[in-house]
Amino acid sequence: MRVSELPVGRFPPLAVVPSSSRVLDVLVAMGRNRVRHVPLVDERGVLKGMVSARDLVDFLGGRRFRDVVEARFNGDVYKALEQTGVEFLKYDPPYVYTRSDLREVIELMVERGIGALAVVDEDLRVVGIVSERHVISLLANVETHVKVKEIMTSEVVYLSPMDSLFEGMRVMSERRIRRLPLVSGEELRGIVTIKDVLSYVSREDVLARLKEGSRSAVYDTPLVYISSKPVLAVEDDVDVGLAVSLMKKHGIGALVVTHDGKPRGIVTERDVLTRLPRVKGVEIFLDEATKTIFGGRVTF
């Protein structure tokens, strides 16, 4: 099953920016298109690098914020965004060709711990992008006989609805996570994703405030203000295939996992991709005819 034949992926990508761009250009492209990876290309469209949402959040509120925004620009976020070249954030991404098969895509994602791969032609020109969300969507409506609690992430970092945007970005950067459930007591009040953060910061009115020097007005914003609502949750004994179907239906990458209605963890597209194949008794099959992935427990 070649990448070019898959009923998933984005061809061409929603956002591609020149490798000579500023960090501000990538923030706007990523935030307003609500994507987590932006390929960088030269004037011929040849892949020259990639910037991830984690890189940007680290620049806005993590280690790079301290090393660059505060140390070099005296805390002026807008000036740092406008004057720092994207070369500072880029990484050299693994990629796949249009002729690559799905198994190669999955193995590369799992082996390198990455969530998206640029798809290139024989001349290394970017023609598309395939993400872990695209891949696991092929598992939708498949009964796996594996419960969500068997693959979920139990050690979840929770924040309060009134914690600030800056605190959220700091935690995302330091803990290398993309989602923060907001909990008051034991009640789930919302969830903030890395896409929510970048979508908010890239808004014209928010950038205008940063340009004016009103960083605190932006960075002190309560997380609940930018959070995704309502929060979708599943009980921990639900089949993984049903959880994937819910993610696909609502266009999201994670579900809060509950037990008797109380939050107990989170299951993400990354959990499905990397942990499901490791569950004892589970086999993964690729159906070339229907271009579908079948995964499930075949021995108990």
UniProtKB/Swiss-Prot annotation:
The entry's keywords: CBS domain, Repeat
Pfam families recorded: CBS
Stretches assigned to the CBS domain: 10-68, 88-148, 152-207, 226-284
PROSITE patterns per the UniProt record, alphabetical: CBS
CDD domains, sorted: CBS_arch_repeat1 (cd17777), CBS_arch_repeat2 (cd17778)
Matching Gene3D superfamilies: CBS-domain (3.10.580.10)
Organism: Thermofilum pendens
Protein name: Uncharacterized 33.4 kDa protein in ribosomal RNA operon
SUPFAM superfamilies membership: CBS-domain pair
SMART domains named in the record: CBS
